[in-house]
Amino acid sequence: MVILLRSGLLCHCQKPWGRVLPKEYLVGIDVGGTFTDILCLEVNSQKLLEAKVPSLPGRQWEGVLNALIELGINAEEISAFVHGTTIATNALLEKKGAKTALITTKGFRDTLEIGRTRRLTGGLFDIKFVRPGPLVERNLRIEVPERTSAYGTILNEIEDYDFVKLGSLLERSGVESVAVCFVNSYANAQNEKKAVSSLKKELELPVCYSAGIVPEQGEFHRFSSCVLNAYLTPVVRKYLSTLKIELQGRGVDSPVNIMGSNGGAMTLEQAGDFAVGTFLSGPVGGVGGAVRVCEMTDVKDSITFDMGGTSTDVALIHNRRPRISYDNQIDAFPLQVPQLDIHTIGAGGGSIAWVQEDGTLEVGPHSAGALPGPACYGRGGIQPTISDANLILGRLPIKRKLSGGLELNKGASEAAFAQLSKKLQGADITSLADGVLRIAVAKMAGAVREVSVHRGFDPRDFALLGFGGAGPMHVFLVAEELAVPTVIVPRYPGHLSAMGQLLADQRQDMVLSWGGRLENLSGGDLLSRIEVMEKESEALLSGNGFAVDRQMHEFSVDMRYTGQSFTLAVPIEKKKMTWDSLRRGFGERHEQTFGHQDSSNECEIVNLRLVSRGLVDKPVLTFSEKNDKNPIIESRKIWFDGAWVECSILDRELMAAESTFVGPAIIEEAGGTTVVPPKWKVSVHLSGTLFCENPFKKI
């Protein structure tokens, strides 16, 4: 294997991670659909090292090991290891989770099947729509005679139920995991906990309960979230166990943390118990890295644009805080756990261009993946992709090898597009490649609108931050489509997700179902309850090695107007909280989201929330020195706006801090290529981040 070992930016931090580090390296590894990226902070020299290797579907842990080998560091010298994985997502989408049983309250066996009145997939007008079935077969949905009232009173205890017989039945049925979901358990989980305790005495299987996953109102969403967790737990635990064994077998004895969907890191044990908290384990790292870029460059508001080989992920960052969603959907299943508000579409470098039945050109969502990959990879792929289109248009290098020693084959790309052209009445392949990019850009612009306009924000008030292996190639076109005034391209854009993982704080989310109309509540009661929550979370973080002065706790309340069925989260400060400030904050949030507020209506509190973080120190990335080197390494013709334009090719490592230039230009670096269209003005920040001004922005 050819070792790719490149060092660049220096990292200046007073003390790494806020703790004494006996060893040398901090490592972040992000597994994507096409590539596995690794970024490493070398503590002694404060340098960043990076590498990129192909992902291995079905063997993610092997890709992780290959990334470590490619980087060329000693495993024994790794002191912290954070990993983003797509194991949970893949298991659900491919329906390869565990055989799961549901133990529920008598009369609620079919809650998962009944669901809600709206379709979660398929579209409202799809006449061929077939509703996906629940993850638990009906014969494995077992009712028990228990009942708890909505106020938490135990109406029917569960002590007398025969769990020995139930355990024997589940064992004979080949069940691999169990979800215990009782009605109103959010108000009092006593019966659920007793059932879990009894089942664990009879079965050596994972058993989870709904109030332990989502202690909130709404049995359908709570049941669905718990069943998802049970369905995925054996798969996630098996992967994490294999990963730990393989890493230890190769000398890695440092703690291994997993990125959570909420944007923070968690221990292997936490990830094994809370599998549904890892659905966005990969994409959230990029958002975390983007937040760090914003902090270093004094940018308050940005929209992340993370384009890889398989998909594009976008998220909105307001006041350097990514938005959190508590009411989510994965595939056809509701998931009511906190995760970053990331919108994903099937448009990546490997997305396949194809012709629909009506003869129109389409791009994605199907992808060529890592194997065989785009035609230009020379690994047996024959279908035209977005990467092939970029190569045909001159945006990717032919002579220069990419990360991992990959050398692109333009002839293979042209052959793939020639076959596509035959289905479109012999269209010119250059124009066809340009059309493929335009279709992809339109879809990606729609994704940006989804997280901004649809949430009450104007994208023109934000910078567009492009990263991922393919993000910097397309982010400028998306910015022109939306009239976004500024594009930001960080250093190491292809490894920003790994950087976000490396720098991730440890995070814990807690929720308490408590509330009512404000006029009927006591402020002292609210404050006493959040004090209890804070002490519990403080103890958990202290147990994970974070001193009290390395912890941060933030509170919010879920509120709604009387008669509404949905809530909005309103931040609160313990020392400044009043009912008037809560009403005002909720009204402002409601108006921002929905365009109006109703000051005549009563407000209600539904939940209390706590977000706790164990803080790690963040390095400040800077160039070691300015230089007077010429970054231009060659020139070639690039297709822009319907014509071939002579364009300078720049080596990013040679670009001096505080230098400026005007496009067109191609900026090449390990792990990413930036395509700067004509007339865009580019400035190099001290951190190496590119600030690019849109000449076509609208006021």
Predicted segment positions?
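ATP-dependent carbohydrate kinase catalytic cores
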Residues: 61, 67-71, 211-218, 222-225, ...
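Active-site phosphate-binding/coordination module
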Residues: 98-152, 210-214, 500
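Phosphate-binding loop and its immediate beta->loop->alpha context
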Residues: 48-72, 108, 132-166, 176-177, ...
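N-terminal glycine/serine-rich phosphate-binding loop of ATP-dependent small-molecule kinases
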Residues: 2-100, 149, 156-179, 192-210, ...
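C-terminal, non-catalytic interaction/recognition modules in large multi-subunit enzymes and RNPs
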Residues: 31, 161-165, 169, 299, ...
